[in-house]
Each structure stands twice: as structure tokens, then as C-alpha cells.
């Protein structure tokens, strides 16, 4: 009986010690867990415990936020007029209106684009030299280079209305002049609708090339490959003209422009297959400045502003306009542009586009 008392006492003391040890261990475990969180000791593959007060979907919210970042309009094509002096059968920006913004309103819109991140502006039409005999265009070009200090200012034109006087007045502010030339055969140009009576489109192209060299403007050629020129060999002509880029497009249908009931053109007869387009590219693979653009690459990879400064969404095979950036701002309007930035980069949309960086041998 005398032995039972010490034994019972020892058991009681052991039980109390175990309880205290358990409490101490629990406290240490909690402390260690917080140290791991604070010092970043958690395994990268394991989920970290949620801190009280932090939303459960923080990571998802951040990912969603990243995906809804506003699109930056790095490169924009501004079709400020739809009027043209040519009648190309496959044209996909036709003369459905005669509207042109007042010059100061156009400048205001360009300033908004600059503030949103614009680096390159490309003026197109229609025929951009048609408005005020090129003076409207020249003033916009000068404004973009001199006041907005854009790295690149370019123009796409059929070239028929350009005079040397324009180069003298505005050439220093222009980085790239792209001339549309679909064929070096005048009969083919006439079939396409790129002809003006006795004027020779090819001879005019050569004259423009000289002026670009004389006034230090980078020279570029755009060609739309279609049913009438798909078998042509342009190698020697392109090499002789030596453009900085030769953009080769596959003829494209846009509902309401060159296809469908409301269209001003019927381009179906100009269409070629993907295989025919690839054959043309293969024939010209030795031309180092060749930049091909199939219909797939063109789709949704351009930011296009129309004459009202509305972004045009072409994802549905037609041109659905946003509200004007002059009314709602760039960030709001660009949400409806349908722009595919990945395809823009994939097609080579970002390149050396400033003549200061091109370092050409004038």
C-alpha cells in the first residue's frame, strides 16, 4: 500500500508534464508555420494557407486582371478617307461615305492615340493624297512627327496623285511610303482596276522610287495576289526597285465592302486558294524583303480606324465599328476592335519602322 502512493503521484505528474509538453509543441508548431509563411519557406508547388481577410480567389482575380489589361494601340492604320480615284475590283475599304474629319479633330484623335501608347501611324484610304491634293495628309504627317514625336509615320497610296512638291514640303516627316503595285503588266493592272487612261502605273512607280531616295523616305511595295496576277513572276522587278519591305497579301473578302448585298465591289472572281498563294510565295522566296500575309495572318491582326475614328472589328468577316475614340476615348473604343495582338506579332507587325533606325544607304 505504501508503494501505491508514490506510483500514483508519479503517474499524475507524468500526465501533467505531457499536457504541458503538448501545449508547448502546439504553440511551436503554429509559430513555425507562420515563420514559413513570412519567410517564404513553403514549397513552391504547395498552396499557401489563406490569410484571414484575404479573398479566397486572389490569384484568380489577379489573373483575370491581367487578362483584361487594356490593349495598347502600338500600331494603327487610320483610313481617314474612303474616296479613291482607282476602282480596284477587290478593294476592301470602299467609298461608302465621303466624310473626312476636320483637321483639328483628326489631330485631337491622334493625340489621344499617342497618350494611349501609339508608336506607329499608317495613313491610308481610299487614296489619302486625294483630300486637298495631299495637303490634309501632309499636315497630319508633320503633326505626328513634329508635335507627337511618333517613331514611325507611314502612308499607303496608289501613287498616282503624288507630286515632287509634296516630298519637298513633307518628306522629312515621313518614314515609309508604301505604294500599291499588284502587277508589272499594264494589261493586268487594267483588268484589276488599277489604271488611269494613258498613265503608266509601273513607270510612275519607278519615278516615286527615285523621289523616295532623293528625299530620304523608306520605300515599300504592297501587292495583293489575286486571280489575275497569281502566275506572274515579279522577281526581277522587285529586286530592281529594292524596297525595304514587299508586303504580299492574299486577296480577302470582307462582307459589306467587296462581298454581299451592300458591297460596292464583287471580289469573288479575284479569289485564289491557299495553295495558289503558297505557290506564288515559293516562286519569290529569293526576294529577301518579302513579307507574306495570308488571309489567316491578316485576320484580326490590324488595328483599323475608319474616317470617324472608330475601330473596325473584322472578326466576323465584316467591319463592325466601335464608338469613336473622339467620343469615348481610346481605352473604351479599343475593347471592340477584335484585335489579336499575338497574330499581330506573329505576322511581323512590329519591325524596324523608323527611317532613323533603318540606316539606309540613300
Swiss-Prot record:
Keywords linked to the UniProt accession: 4Fe-4S, Acetylation, Antiviral defense, Endoplasmic reticulum, Golgi apparatus, Immunity, Innate immunity, Iron, Iron-sulfur, Isopeptide bond, Lipid droplet, Lyase, Membrane, Metal-binding, Mitochondrion, Mitochondrion inner membrane, Mitochondrion outer membrane, S-adenosyl-L-methionine, Ubl conjugation
EC number per UniProt: 4.2.-.-
Listed GO CC annotations: endoplasmic reticulum; endoplasmic reticulum membrane; fibrillar center; Golgi apparatus; lipid droplet; mitochondrial inner membrane; mitochondrial outer membrane
A Pfam family of this chain: Radical_SAM
Compartments it resides in: Endoplasmic reticulum membrane; Golgi apparatus; Endoplasmic reticulum; Lipid droplet
Modified residues (N6-acetyllysine): 198
EC class (word): lyase
Single Gene Ontology MF annotation: 4 iron, 4 sulfur cluster binding
Coiled-coil portions: none
Radical SAM core domain location: 70-290
Cofactor section: [4Fe-4S] cluster
A single GO BP: CD4-positive, alpha-beta T cell differentiation
Entry keyword annotation includes Transferase: no
Membrane-protein topology: Peripheral membrane protein
Expression sites (tissue/organ): Expressed at higher levels in atherosclerotic arteries than in normal arteries.
Region (Disordered): 47-73
Induction (UniProt): By interferon type I, type II and LPS. Induced by infection with Vesicular stomatitis virus and pseudorabies virus in dendritic cells, presumably through type I interferon pathway.
Activity regulation comment: IRAK1 and TRAF6 synergistically activate RSAD2 increasing its activity with CTP as substrate about 10-fold.
Cofactor detail note: Binds 1 [4Fe-4S] cluster. The cluster is coordinated with 3 cysteines and an exchangeable S-adenosyl-L-methionine.
Description of post-translational modifications: Acetylated by HAT1. HAT1-mediated acetylation of Lys-198 in turn recruits UBE4A that stimulates RSAD2 polyubiquitination leading to proteasomal degradation. 'Lys-6'-linked polyubiquitination at Lys-207 leads to RSAD2 protein degradation.
Catalytic activity: CTP + AH2 + S-adenosyl-L-methionine = 3'-deoxy-3',4'-didehydro-CTP + 5'-deoxyadenosine + L-methionine + A + H2O + H(+)
Domain commentary: The N-terminal region (1-43) is necessary for its localization to the endoplasmic reticulum membrane and lipid droplet.
Summary of subunit composition and partner proteins: Homodimer. Interacts with IRAK1 and TRAF6. Interacts with FPPS. Interacts with HADHB. Interacts (via C-terminus) with VAPA/VAP33 (via C-terminus).
Protein name per the record: S-adenosylmethionine-dependent nucleotide dehydratase RSAD2
Organism: Mus musculus
Gene designation per UniProt: Rsad2
Amino acid at each position: 500500500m505504501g508503494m501505491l502512493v508514490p506510483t500514483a503521484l508519479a503517474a499524475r505528474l507524468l500526465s501533467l508534464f505531457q499536457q504541458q509538453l503538448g501545449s508547448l509543441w502546439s504553440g511551436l508548431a503554429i509559430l513555425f508555420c507562420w515563420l514559413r509563411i513570412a519567410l517564404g519557406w513553403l514549397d513552391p508547388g504547395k498552396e499557401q494557407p489563406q490569410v484571414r481577410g484575404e479573398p479566397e480567389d486572389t490569384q484568380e482575380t489577379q489573373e483575370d486582371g491581367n487578362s483584361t489589361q487594356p490593349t495598347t494601340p502600338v500600331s494603327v492604320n487610320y483610313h481617314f478617307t474612303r474616296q479613291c480615284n482607282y476602282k480596284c475590283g477587290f478593294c476592301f475599304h470602299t467609298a461608302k461615305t465621303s466624310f473626312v474629319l476636320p483637321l483639328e479633330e483628326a489631330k485631337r484623335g491622334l493625340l489621344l492615340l499617342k497618350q494611349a501608347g501609339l508608336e506607329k501611324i499608317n495613313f491610308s484610304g481610299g487614296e489619302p493624297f486625294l483630300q486637298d491634293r495631299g495637303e490634309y495628309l501632309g499636315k497630319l504627317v508633320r503633326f505626328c512627327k513634329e508635335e507627337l514625336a511618333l517613331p514611325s509615320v507611314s502612308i499607303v497610296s496608289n501613287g498616282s496623285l503624288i507630286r515632287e512638291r509634296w516630298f519637298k514640303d513633307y518628306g522629312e516627316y515621313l518614314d515609309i511610303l508604301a505604294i500599291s503595285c499588284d502587277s508589272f503588266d499594264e494589261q493586268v493592272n487594267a483588268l484589276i482596276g488599277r489604271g488611269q487612261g494613258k498613265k503608266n502605273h509601273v513607270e510612275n512607280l519607278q519615278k516615286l522610287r527615285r523621289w523616295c531616295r532623293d528625299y530620304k523616305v523608306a520605300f515599300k511595295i504592297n501587292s495583293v495576289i489575286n486571280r489575275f496576277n497569281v502566275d506572274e513572276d515579279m522577281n526581277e522587278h522587285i529586286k530592281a526597285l529594292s524596297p525595304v519591305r514587299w508586303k504580299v497579301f492574299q486577296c480577302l473578302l470582307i462582307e459589306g465592302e467587296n462581298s454581299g448585298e451592300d458591297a460596292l465591289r464583287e471580289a469573288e472572281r479575284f479569289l485564289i486558294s491557299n495553295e495558289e498563294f503558297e505557290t506564288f510565295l515559293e516562286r519569290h522566296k529569293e526576294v529577301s524583303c518579302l513579307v507574306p500575309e495570308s488571309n489567316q495572318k491578316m485576320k484580326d491582326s490590324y488595328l483599323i480606324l475608319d474616317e470617324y475614328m472608330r475601330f473596325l472589328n473584322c472578326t466576323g468577316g465584316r467591319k463592325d465599328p466601335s464608338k469613336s475614340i473622339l467620343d469615348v476615348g481610346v481605352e473604351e473604343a479599343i475593347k471592340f476592335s477584335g484585335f489579336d495582338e499575338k497574330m499581330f506579332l506573329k505576322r511581323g507587325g512590329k519591325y524596324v519602322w523608323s527611317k532613323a533606325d533603318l540606316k539606309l544607304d540613300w
